[in-house]
């Protein structure tokens, strides 16, 4: 269990409403949903599908309840202290509570991503986060919402989750 995070969020996490009580709770990271490949392109495109750009950064899961925020890595480690700008972007969202899935990426001045090695080193570094932030600032790209204002969205179709996401996340963060 992530005791320090649970203590920040009141001991047991915020219980979400809905059928998946316990599956998505603020303060308790959940394993990320990962893309899967199909044996043939025709099979992948047979039903409804979504095509997106691959953002090669640090996979992050953001948790917010009121003024409290936590950022978790793909491995479910609490990396809030290492990525303060991600935590700030999460805190600024106009929702009471949320669990979001996204990528944190270092961008060049022209808007193109830095090589992954530079971005990936941010979460793993033991250097001072303020120094790292000045050297390699991160931009946050939230691409999915698992919970918003205490409503669990895990069973909702991607189109519905994206609608909620568009209401709570500005297009540029």
Task: Name what the model sees in each region.
Residues 1-173:
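Catalytic cores of nucleic-acid ligases and guanylyltransferases
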């Amino acid at each position: 269990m992530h005791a320090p995070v649970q203590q920040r969020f009141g001991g047991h996490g915020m219980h979400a409403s809905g059928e998946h009580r316990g599956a998505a709770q603020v303060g308790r990271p959940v394993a990320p949903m990962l893309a899967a490949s199909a044996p043939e392109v025709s099979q992948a495109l047979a039903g409804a599908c979504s095509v997106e750009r691959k953002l090669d950064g640090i996979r992050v899961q953001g948790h917010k309840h009121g003024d409290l925020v936590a950022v978790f890595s793909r491995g479910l480690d609490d990396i809030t202290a290492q990525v303060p700008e991600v935590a700030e972007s999460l805190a600024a969202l106009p929702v009471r509570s949320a669990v979001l899935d996204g990528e944190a990426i270092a961008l060049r001045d022209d808007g193109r991503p830095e090589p992954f090695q530079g971005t990936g080193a941010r979460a793993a570094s033991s250097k001072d986060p303020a120094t790292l932030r000045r050297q390699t600032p991160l931009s946050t790209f939230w691409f999915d919402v698992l919970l918003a204002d205490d409503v669990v969205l895990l069973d909702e179709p991607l189109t519905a989750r994206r609608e909620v996401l568009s209401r709570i996340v500005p297009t540029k963060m």
